[in-house]
């Protein structure tokens, strides 16, 4: 196993160094060589212990990406090439601006994003394990406080959409813990990673990145400044860019769709479910019900939808006890 890892790493080193030699000064090349050698030493240190084949495979994947990382961050990367050739993007961003936005992808974050895609908790854990993350006394109590503080808003949203307010509470809790955990990654790094390194997500990520850049241009926001989830969702409700464009609404009618405002966020989560076959005048919150199926469109995971329903039920139960 160690011999295999060393052979892979030696090949990666050659490829990476050839890339560096083709595009850097001598000083930059020496810096790159030192960085690559340091990563190899760290990698070999890790595999010197009792690593399983699965863990070794993950380390090889991440370190191989780090060796080739410099190639994708250059103007000929798939991400930059796609944007430069897109007619809509051409009208609002120059080639130089696009290259500038992507000139410094965060390498450590790219590696973290790849690992997170491989270890999605809603996909890799059982329902019992996954639900324990979210169904806690602390989250339930926080949901009750949040609901009481925004009771009139929830009632107004319910009148318009007929979407259960406690289900919306549950989703807000799971997505960002009421705005506390909005994600640590720059969205440009999320989409860059998916386009460059995850072929099955490339086309999807290109659409999201394009819409995200259009949003940033219209709102006069620096794309590098927006952070969100590893998958590319942002704001209190964690909308992806295309869903933000089509389903996020200006609920308070102030002329702006605000992903960091609770009025628009609560209204938009309800609107999202309503537009995705949420059944009106239906109180069936069982697993595989029509309501469950609507929630599943928010995050296409059975565990997610089931946990959202369970958490909603627990919040409602405690609310009745308070009343």
Outline where the language-model segments fall.
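Ser/Thr-rich, low-complexity intrinsically disordered segments
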Residues: 3-14, 25-38
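Short hydrophobic targeting helices and cationic amphipathic motifs
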Residues: 9, 44-46, 51-52
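Short, mixed-charge aromatic SLiMs
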Residues: 32-33, 37-40, 264, 299
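Cell-wall glycan-active module
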Residues: 50-59, 65-206, 211-227, 232, ...
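Functionally critical loop-and-helix segments that line ligand-binding/catalytic clefts
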Residues: 238
